[in-house]
């Protein structure tokens, strides 16, 4: 594992503790992409630390969380927020959030790394594309695009189910995915190594083509 900044090591400790305390938690967002990437040889070099953590939570575990943490509602984004030590956590509750993939689906297919549940690649792709659509013109949008690329690279080396990936994929998600695959972030991730960037793009494009073959825009909502 690459050397980590001490702040991020502490965040990972808090993530592990939250995951241990609440049965209904599954991590999403950048922290989930990191845990997938760092645990696979093909993508570990591209794993990127994050400053906060997002998770989906069941209603029963949300009640337990309220008893321990001081949650601040964010009705505009349909989530709750809290601080644990110095770190920010965004909480998306079952049947209360507007995330495109239902909680039950995400939890049913979640995978674990060292006891921490994270969304499967197929669900994480759609959740990340939702963020990428909303923030594509910002610096956050660039990070979203890189996370989408990491997911595609992971999908190249894993049993990626394209049919599951498109089940909740909207036309805007698919369009943004195409822009990302054709975009410039591969060069940035490869730190200017044109040969590596080309290989990464080819591998990501293979997974995109699998998705494109089964995606039906008529079923998009």
Task: Kindly label every feature range from the protein language model.
Residues 1-221:
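Compositionally biased terminal segments of proteins
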């Amino acid at each position: 594992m690459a050397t980590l900044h001490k702040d991020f090591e502490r965040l990972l400790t808090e993530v592990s503790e939250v995951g241990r305390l609440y049965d209904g938690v599954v991590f999403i967002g950048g922290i989930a992409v990191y845990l997938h990437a760092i645990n696979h040889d093909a993508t570990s070099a591209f794993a990127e630390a994050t400053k906060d953590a997002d998770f989906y939570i069941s209603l029963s575990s949300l009640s337990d969380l309220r008893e321990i943490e001081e949650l601040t509602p964010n009705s505009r984004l349909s989530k709750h927020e809290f601080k644990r030590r110095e770190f920010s956590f965004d909480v998306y509750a079952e049947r209360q959030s507007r995330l495109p993939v239902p909680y039950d689906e995400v939890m049913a297919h979640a995978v674990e790394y060292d006891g921490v549940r994270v969304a499967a690649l197929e669900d994480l792709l759609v959740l990340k594309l939702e963020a990428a659509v909303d923030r594509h013109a910002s610096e956050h949008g660039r990070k979203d695009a890189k996370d989408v690329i990491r997911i595609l690279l992971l999908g190249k080396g894993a049993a990626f189910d394209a049919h599951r990936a498109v089940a909740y994929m909207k036309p805007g998600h698919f369009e943004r995915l195409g822009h990302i695959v054709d975009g410039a972030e591969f060069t940035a991730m490869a730190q200017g190594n044109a040969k590596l960037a080309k290989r990464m793009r080819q591998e990501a494009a293979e997974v995109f083509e699998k998705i494109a073959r089964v995606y039906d825009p008529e079923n998009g909502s």
